[in-house]
Amino acid sequence: MSAGVFWWWFFLCAVGGLNILAWSLSAGYLRRRRAVLCAEEYASRRLQLLLSAGYVFGCAFRSVMPVYDVGRVCLFDSWLCSVIIGRSVATFAELCFAAQWALLLRDISRATGSGVGRVTAKVMVPLIAVAEMCSWYSVLTTSNLGHVVEESIWALSAGLLVTSLLWIWPRCSASLRPLLAAWCAAGIAYVAFMFLIDVPMYWSRWLADEASGRHYLSITQGLLDVSGRWVVSHSWDVWKNEIAWMSLYFSVAVWLSIALVHAPVLARGVTDSKPRR
């Protein structure tokens, strides 16, 4: 294994371990706060915690066993590194992450009486489920057209979330608006990145494949391929294009998932008087 790839993998493993520790501390903190949370509030935060677990542990697994899906490339010669395992874990984790945002938006919408927010909260997970199916299509067939649709849906979902938060803005208390503004700014930046860089990249790859007459796999052929074939590579040149997004995805995105468990906008059920009986 080249030195660069080793230290990158070591970084991913260390971050994955720290993320599990952070989630465990978060779970303990929520348990200690149960006495000052109303039943509805505690149930909502506990569900956030469970959904976060799906994302945190899923990303930790993928940190230890990184896989480059389209190229069927991995670091270790093990069936655990097969694309079908890695993509299955990723699908579950990403649905959990989407559900966290949907749950958060649902709670904010209930607290502020926003119908727009409630509708958006209901459609977010189904939209991401469709995006995951498009991802599977691309991974199995090796056609980048599925990734074009997948990334477009992710961007659309983020855009709907930002729109809903902006709609809710006038109804939120002044103390929560800085956090709301930060989420909106991050969401707008994400949408811009997806539509200006990510989606065009996959679109250009698909056009190049079409121009070269690339032969795509069928769904059945793809299933057999991702189940039984993986290519072990420790070369920096092979992994260099995956390092940046994987490093951010398995660190910053996971921290955000853990933070959502204790988001201040969910605190409408907190009491400062006597503990709940």
Short names for language-model regions:
Residues 23-33, 63-70, 87-121, 129-139, ...:
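Internal transmembrane alpha-helix with an interfacial aromatic "cap," most often the third helix
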